Each structure stands twice: as C-alpha cells, then as structure tokens.
C-alpha cells in the first residue's frame, strides 16, 4: 500500500493498484504519477541516476531492524553503500516487520525495513512519542508467491482457493474447505494426499500481508507449520512433496514451483512475472519499504540521507533486481526522496 496526501491509499489488490480512502501515512510519492503509469515507464531501473558520493563526511552506525524478507536485500545495500563510505558500521536484525515500528519509535535503529503497512496502533505509538507519523519509503516491489513442490502438477489457483486451503474461515467465499490435492482436481497419486501447509509467524510482515489479501483477513488454520523465515518456508516445501507455502518471489529455487494466481475464480491465473506486477495484473504484488524517523520540514542527517539516495539510485535498484525483486522507477524514487526530506540527489 502507498498512502498519498488527501487520504488516498494505493495498494496492489485484485488485478490493479486500487485507490482506497484510508490515509495511514502521509507519503507524497506518486502524488503526481499513477502507479501503473509510473512503473510501466521503466521496469529495469536504468532511468535512475547513478549514485554520486557526498562531498562531506558520512559516518556512523547504520542499524536496520525489521523484515526478515528484506534481510539479504538490506545486506546488499549496506555492502554497496560501504564501498563509498568504508567507515560506516552496519548492523542488520531480521526479526520480522513487527519489530521495526517499536525500534524506530524508540530510536534503537536507523531504518525499519518492512514488507507490510504500519498498523494504526503502531502509528499512534510512534506519534505519541514524536508528535508526527513515521515516513515510509517504497524501495522495491515484491510478488508474494504460493509455492508447491517442483513435481506438483497444479496449474493455478484463485485467491478464493488459496483462502480455502490456508484459512479456517473461508472469508473469500469458498463453499467448502480444501484439504487434499484431489479437492483441487489433481488425479493419480495426488488425489488422496493431504495438503501440508507451511507459512510464517505473526511477527512477519509477509504473514500479515498474506492474511489480509489472500485470506481476506481471515484466520490461518492451526495446521499451518510456522517457519522462522522466508527461506525456511521454501526449503520446507521443497522437502515435502505434498507441501504448499507462501513467501516472497525472491526466494524461488529450482526445487519449488511458483503457482499462477487469479484474483477471482472467473479470471485466468497469472504467473508471478515482472510485466504482470508492473501492470497490476498479479494479485499479490506489494511494495517493500524502509521506514525512517523524519521530522516534517527538516532534512535528514548525512548518513540517513545518503543511504536513501543510494538505495533509490541505479546501483541500489540493481541490488533490488539482483535479489529477485522489482525496481521502483525514477518518478517513484524522486517523489519518495522528497517526502523523506532529501532535497536533491
């Protein structure tokens, strides 16, 4: 989700990035550009300027606390950033997106990587301490993917079916629970085999996003085997012929398959491909964020300013692509930097 001035929220859902009427965080990115138009302009990041080293001193401790999904990506950014500023010390703690808001509010981290939106209660806690909301900067695009074992012949799923597989509530409208592969139409050895469920725990932003958009805010079945990280989910599915799980697209391996998804039972399932995400056709595309404590009307200190400039530069977005995610584009990056108090590149 991306929140714009005036109460407009844009989020990936149901085959397009829909404007909603709930304002959570006043971020100016994309205030001028529609998301689909801005992203479609450039899916490679080549329009972004290269990073230019700052003329003044940039030093200190760069500590990031938050999303496990973004752990490797943040490490790539830190590695590239230190090539320009070797004296910078970095520390990365991937405890889950839920750990970012309190760490940022309490001042124990520099940035809070998150793979989900801030909850209203988290924003209120931050505002009660600082008097203004956190700034949330979109830094990459991810596709949340449903994985099955590489030998599984399943051709596609609707979100209604995903809900009936993972949720005990079936808020998405399915009339019956889905417990076996035969319930999805598979034959032969698969027909009677129970579906083994793998997922994340409640501290994970991926868990929260999947719960909201794939489970229609329903509750997970108690049979979901919670894993400590995104890669652990994929490894579990790779080791379980009858398993299914969800994780970010960047964790795809040769031992699992990404299942094409459809927003509705009437729609054709769409593979998790870049073109589909940029066009708004893949139903579980989402922004990844860096949250920062930025007092409105001020500029960030050199360390935070330059790290954001690096992340949203050609080099930083090349790291995004290297880690299996999709880059944001120049219009998105430029507006996000302005919103975060970075006056120029």
Segments predicted by a language model, with ranges:
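N-terminal secretory signal peptides that target proteins for export/translocation
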Residues: 1-19
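Generic short amphipathic/hydrophobic targeting helices enriched at N-termini
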Residues: 4-6, 20-21, 28, 54
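N-terminal compositionally biased, intrinsically disordered segments and leader/signal-like regions
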Residues: 9-11, 33, 45
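Bacterial N-terminal signal peptides
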Residues: 22-36
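Flexible loop/hinge segments at secondary-structure junctions
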Residues: 40-345
């Amino acid at each position: 989700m991306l929140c714009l001035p005036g109460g407009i929220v844009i989020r990936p859902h149901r085959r397009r990035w829909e404007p909603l009427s709930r304002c959570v965080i006043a971020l100016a990115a994309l205030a001028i550009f529609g998301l689909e138009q801005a992203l479609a302009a450039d899916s490679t990041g080549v329009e972004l300027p290269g990073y230019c080293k700052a003329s003044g001193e940039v030093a200190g401790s760069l500590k990031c606390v938050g999303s496990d999904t973004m752990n490797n990506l943040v490490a790539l950014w830190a590695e590239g950033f230190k090539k320009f500023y070797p004296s910078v010390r970095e520390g990365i703690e991937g405890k889950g997106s839920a750990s970012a808001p309190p760490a940022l509010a309490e001042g124990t981290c520099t940035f809070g990587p998150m793979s989900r939106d801030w909850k209203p209660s988290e924003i209120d806690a931050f505002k009660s301490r600082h008097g203004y909301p956190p700034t949330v900067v979109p830094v990459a695009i991810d596709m949340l993917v449903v994985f099955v074992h590489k030998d599984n012949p399943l051709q596609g799923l609707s979100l209604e079916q995903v809900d009936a597989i993972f949720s005990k509530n079936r808020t998405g409208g399915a009339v019956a629970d889905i417990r076996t592969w035969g319930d999805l139409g598979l034959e032969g050895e698969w027909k009677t085999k129970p579906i083994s469920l793998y997922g994340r725990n409640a501290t994970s932003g991926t868990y929260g996003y999947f719960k909201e958009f794939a489970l229609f805010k329903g509750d997970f079945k108690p049979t979901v085997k919670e894993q400590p990280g995104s890669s652990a989910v994929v490894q579990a599915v790779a080791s379980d012929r009858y398993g299914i799980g969800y994780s970010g697209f960047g964790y795809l391996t040769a031992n699992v398959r990404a299942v094409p998804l459809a927003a509705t039972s009437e729609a054709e399932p769409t593979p998790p491909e870049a073109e589909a995400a940029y066009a708004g056709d893949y139903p579980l595309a989402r922004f990844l964020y860096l949250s920062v404590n930025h007092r409105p009307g001020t500029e960030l200190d050199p360390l935070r300013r330059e790290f954001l400039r690096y992340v949203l530069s050609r080099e930083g977005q090349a790291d995004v692509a290297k880690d299996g995610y999709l880059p944001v584009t120049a219009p998105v990056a430029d507006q996000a930097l302005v919103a975060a108090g970075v006056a120029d590149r």
